[in-house]
Amino acid sequence: MAEGEIEDRELEELRRKKLEELQKKAELERQAQIAAAQRRMALKRILTPEALARLDNIRIVRPELAEALEQQIIALASSGRVKVPIDDNTLKKILEAVYSQTRKEYKFRL
């Protein structure tokens, strides 16, 4: 077998693997976008416009906190533990609870 044929096969195999990786990545991104759209639709049904605006503002500043807050809101609403629609004041109370759970505490030793 010629050396060029081996290199061509190896190159083709690398291309095929790279294409598979890109396709998997694109599929994962598509699934993430679908999940985000479904969460957004659920939040629009659960939250008042003022509360939704507050959540959007939180998302700009602290995306990880907003994600935890979204999960908590959806869980509370689906279990019936909170009255829907959730107004801004109720959202603030939920935010306090979630923030206290997710807040990182830093300790410094001297």
Swiss-Prot record:
Cellular component GO terms, alphabetically? Answer: cytosol
Molecular function (GO) terms listed?
DNA binding
Keywords (A to Z) from UniProt: DNA-binding
Q: Which domain of life is it from?
A: Archaea
Q: Which Pfam families match?
A: dsDNA_bind
Q: Does the keyword DNA damage apply?
A: no
The entry sums up its family as follows: Belongs to the PDCD5 family.
According to UniProt, the name of this protein is: DNA-binding protein Pars_1791
Q: Give the organism, scientific name.
A: Pyrobaculum arsenaticum (strain DSM 13514 / JCM 11321 / PZ6)
